[in-house]
């Protein structure tokens, strides 16, 4: 009996269902510790909190693993190796986009401040000292686990499900948007979207998730190092004897000072713009000199690629939009989710 090969539209629909289920699963994992029970964790050390964060990230990959097992996809395809030069270039890109990301976050923080919003401060344990163990736990959660999990799900399974159904440019945009909205942070929307699009481009162009993993690791590690330095400098400048602590989870949200528009513009022109140009040059070179991946462009006729295939994607975006709206309502004080 000949093996039945599913239509590309069926693969697209199945991947949309994965996106929907993963969104619900991820929200269930992070909603309670982020909003509803934030004060319940005040007795835990930053080390424990970052280990909890790493555990949640590992749990979030379960839907993708089950999806791969049920659909009998080969991990050797999803985890296809990349050339060493591609991985190195990916890491370099991840480093270059950090100043651009910070500048976008500054501009966004300025916009939120000018429109009456307030940046949410993450819950911080009151007494523990910033130790090597805490930094190591943060590194494990942010620089190792998060890039591996997110790249496998987004740039591996979800992006691959769009091959043969959508043009490459549309697939890059769709995956980048989904990645951004799953973070659920309005203040970081422009910077996360920029990073998500760059990561997706690297995966599509190289045909492997490893350049995007390298970029993701370099990006997160750079932000972590900057935050540790900022904590140390702030501690030295403060007259209080208590040591600084690392906010769990470590994010740029809540650490970005409000700037006026002129200051934000200066930051962009003097710091971020040269890095943005450099990033563009590196990405152009990556595109120009990387071997083509054989991305499956859509065929002329795709049976069943209408609403039956697209509704899971629409549902996933609706769920994530509601999740993002929760953050907006919190930012502007319309509702109070974090208890005082």
Which ranges hold each PLM region?
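Hydrophobic alpha-helical transmembrane segments of integral membrane proteins
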Residues: 29-30, 59-60, 95-96, 143-144, ...
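Juxtamembrane helix-loop-helix connectors linking adjacent transmembrane helices
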Residues: 41-52, 75-146, 164, 325-340
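Alpha-helical transmembrane segments in multi-pass membrane proteins
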Residues: 21-70, 266-276, 336-340
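Membrane-water interface of transmembrane alpha-helices
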Residues: 62-73, 107-111, 276-294
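Short helix-terminus and kink motifs of transmembrane alpha helices
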Residues: 38, 102-109, 155-156, 160, ...
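Interfacial transmembrane-helix boundary/kink motif in multi-pass membrane proteins
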Residues: 2-25, 48-51, 73-105, 296-321
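Transmembrane helix-loop-helix hairpins at the membrane interface
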Residues: 133-339
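Alpha-helical transmembrane segments of multipass membrane proteins
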Residues: 25-34, 60-64, 97-105, 223, ...
């Amino acid at each position: 009996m000949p093996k039945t090969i599913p239509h590309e539209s069926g693969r697209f629909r199945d991947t949309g269902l994965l996106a929907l289920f993963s969104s619900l699963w991820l929200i269930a994992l992070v909603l309670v510790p982020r909003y509803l029970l934030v004060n319940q964790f005040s007795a835990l050390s930053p080390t424990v909190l970052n280990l909890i964060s790493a555990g949640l990230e590992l749990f979030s990959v379960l839907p993708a693993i089950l999806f791969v097992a049920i659909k009998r996809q080969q991990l050797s395809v999803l985890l296809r190796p990349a050339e060493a030069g591609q991985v190195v270039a990916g890491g370099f890109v991840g480093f270059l986009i950090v100043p651009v990301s910070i500048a976008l976050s500054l501009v966004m923080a300025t916009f939120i401040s000018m429109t009456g919003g307030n940046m949410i401060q993450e819950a911080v344990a009151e007494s523990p000292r910033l130790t090597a163990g805490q930094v190591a736990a943060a590194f494990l959660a942010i620089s190792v686990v998060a890039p591996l999990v997110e790249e496998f799900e987004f740039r591996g399974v979800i992006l691959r499900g769009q091959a043969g159904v959508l043009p490459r440019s549309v697939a890059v945009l769709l995956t980048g948007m989904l990645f951004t909205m799953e973070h659920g942070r309005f203040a970081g929307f422009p910077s996360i979207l920029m990073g998500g699009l760059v990561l997706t481009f690297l995966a599509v162009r190289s045909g492997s998730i490893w350049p995007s993993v390298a970029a993701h690791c370099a990006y997160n590690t750079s932000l972590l190092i900057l935050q540790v330095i900022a904590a140390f400098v702030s501690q030295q400048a403060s007259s209080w004897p208590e040591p600084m602590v690392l906010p769990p989870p470590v994010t740029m949200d809540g650490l970005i000072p409000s700037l006026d528009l002129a200051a934000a513009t200066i930051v962009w022109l003097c710091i971020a713009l040269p890095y943005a140009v450099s990033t563009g040059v590196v990405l152009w070179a990556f595109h120009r000199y990387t071997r083509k991946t054989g991305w499956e462009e859509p065929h002329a006729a795709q049976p069943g690629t209408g609403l039956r295939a697209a509704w899971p994607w629409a549902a996933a975006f609706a769920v994530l939009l509601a999740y993002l709206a929760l953050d907006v309502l919190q930012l502007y004080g319309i509702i109070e989710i974090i208890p005082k």
